[in-house]
Amino acid sequence: MPEAVDPRSWSKRAGRHTPMSIAGVGAVTGYGWGAKHVWDGFMLGESAVQLHTGLDGYVDGGQAYVATISGDGARPGGPSRFMRALRFAAREAIADATERGWQPGPVVGVIHSMVLGDVEMWRDYYRSETGTVGGRQWVQMMPGTVISMMMKENDFHGPAMSVTAMCASGNAGMITAKSWLDTGVATDVILLATDLSGIPENLRRFQDIGVAVLDMPPFEGCRPFQEGSRGFVGGEAAVALVLSNQNVGTYADVLGGAMTMDAWSAVSIAPDMVQMNRCFNEALAVSGVDAGEVAYINAHGPGTAQCDAAEARILDELFPEAHGIFSVKPLIGHCQGAASAVEMLATIYAFQTGYIPAPPRVAPGHPRLITGRTPRRRGMMVKSSIGLGGYNSAVVVAEPTV
């Protein structure tokens, strides 16, 4: 059990805006259970998206391309895919960080980036004849239960909360975690981002509003920043990142980030882009970075006309010196509430291997669109994420200093 520590002995760090290190990584994705499968998928340039059949009555043609997480019910962690994937990712990230020299500080907090929670358990609950389940199962459905189980397993007792900002939830969690470290709320943070909502009911709704493409392979239908793109392909992910100010071997340093809200439309980007521009500029300002120091934009890039046009405009106007822009959604799918967290792994991969894991270009597109696995030039990256409803977010990430 960790020794009790007087908060005054570590709160002297409060207010010191030092880089926040990503010290450990865990992931469950359409590639498989474990971050290694993500690295392998990025290296090979292969998509995790597969064709799923038997969806008659939900999607046109009864089949859809989506990067779902396998059930793998033999793994420990709980009765649902959601719970098992979250706890697996957390275990992997903590073990990874420990191997790299990280040790839990006196106050380890947990932030869970999520949107819909355990959709399969809630779906079964509402579809039951009586609308009731046993008390134990009902408690397991609560979003705080799996966090409590994860923290109990690791003897963590710091602050814990869930954050939601639609598709920008992962970035929202990252920015919140940095504020905790900067102000002394926690000494370390486990950031979790979980979204296993790739069920037929949700896929159909995204198709209905014209943003998802279900009937074409990923590289054909989802073409971020290219002509002929029809939208995004669905995806699922559970990601865990160990975040700390400790001087240990790290994957990347998060310098800062910002968020704004358009407050204009539930489904569209404000055409004047005032708030989106402010978001990127504030992210640079709080990070102490000039736009000219940014080499790449790891974009939200869902392949929808509005989002791609907006981020391309940001690239052209705010980052004219950047080497390029890319989006890994054709590779890993749009993982909704976990999107920006799982896409942060692409930045980590680039820093660790020296290659940008961009999908191949299949049509004419933006002149600075990175195509295929490409050698990386030195410089910082901005991870942007846009959430349905008007959420804008940007996080500035630098190569690790340790």
Locate the predicted segments by residue.
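Phosphate/pyrophosphate-binding loops at sites that engage ATP/ADP/AMP, CoA/4′-phosphopantetheine
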Residues: R91-V108, N154, N247-Y251, C279-Y296, ...
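Acyl-CoA/ACP chain-elongation machinery
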Residues: V185-I209, M216-C222, S229, G257-P271, ...
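Condensing-enzyme catalytic core mediating Claisen C-C bond formation in acyl metabolism
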Residues: T18-V28, A35-Q63, P217-S287, E293-Y296, ...
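Short, well-ordered amphipathic alpha-helical segments that serve as non-catalytic structural scaffolds
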Residues: A85-T98, G144-V146, D272-G288, I314, ...
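Conserved catalytic cysteine-centered active-site region
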Residues: R8-H17, V49-R87, G117-T176, V185, ...
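Conserved small-residue
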Residues: I22-G24, F42, A90, V110, ...
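Glycine-/small-residue-rich "gating" segment that lines the acyl/pantetheine channel
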Residues: G131-V133, I175, S179, S197-G249, ...
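Flexible, low-complexity linker/loop segments at domain and module junctions
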Residues: M1-I22, P104-G105, A291-E293, L369-V402
